[in-house]
């Protein structure tokens, strides 16, 4: 199937070396590789990246990275962030368009939870092939549990809140499948 390597916290050259090793090992056993280039703001895996330290993916570096790593999918930084947004994300669509046209390969949008629907649709129209929305799904789950506990604070039977929380995630997934134009596709 596939694996994801995130060396975006490294220098370009270090990220290339790390990603090359992962690609070589994965491709040897028929597994594709997604890699991240550029740094997203926010928090992921307990690593915090301040907005001032977030760096958009440089199109020239993207070309070098792909040429030297032979990665199968590239996650680029164009203004999204891991975790919940404090403001409204503004995506750099010109950067996305430039990178997609130059690389002509699957492009991934990490940190897309909370990005407005119009921006998601535009990103898809410009060639984004995969969109990560983990935070949005986690929030759908925990928001439902919070709602249930607010109504029934003494509830202790997890069967009474896990099922509804899962259904809330399911509804969010269905909504996103439709938004992404993925319904009916395998």
Model-derived features with residue positions:
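Residue-level marker of alpha-helix boundaries and capping positions
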Residues: 13, 110-111, 167
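Glycine-rich beta-to-alpha transition loops that act as phosphate-gripper elements at the mouths
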Residues: 106-117
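Extended, intrinsically disordered, low-complexity segments
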Residues: 146-186
């Amino acid at each position: 199937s596939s694996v994801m390597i995130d060396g975006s916290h490294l220098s370009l050259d270090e990220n290339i070396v790390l990603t090359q090793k992962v690609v070589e090992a994965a491709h040897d056993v028929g597994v594709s590789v997604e890699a991240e280039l550029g740094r997203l703001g926010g928090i992921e895996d307990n690593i915090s990246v301040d907005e001032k330290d977030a760096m958009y993916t440089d199109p020239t570096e993207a070309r070098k990275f792909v040429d030297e790593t032979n990665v199968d999918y590239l996650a680029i930084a164009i203004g999204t962030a891991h975790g919940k947004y404090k403001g409204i994300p503004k995506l750099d669509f010109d950067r996305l368009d430039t990178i997609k046209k130059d690389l002509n390969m699957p492009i991934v949008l990490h940190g897309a939870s909370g990005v407005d629907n119009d921006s998601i649709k535009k990103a898809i129209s410009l060639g984004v092939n995969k969109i990560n929305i983990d935070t949005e799904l986690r929030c759908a789950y925990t928001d439902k549990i919070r709602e249930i506990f607010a109504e029934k604070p003494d509830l202790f039977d997890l069967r009474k809140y896990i099922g509804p929380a899962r259904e809330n995630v399911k509804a969010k997934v269905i909504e996103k499948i439709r938004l992404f134009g993925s319904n009916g596709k395998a």
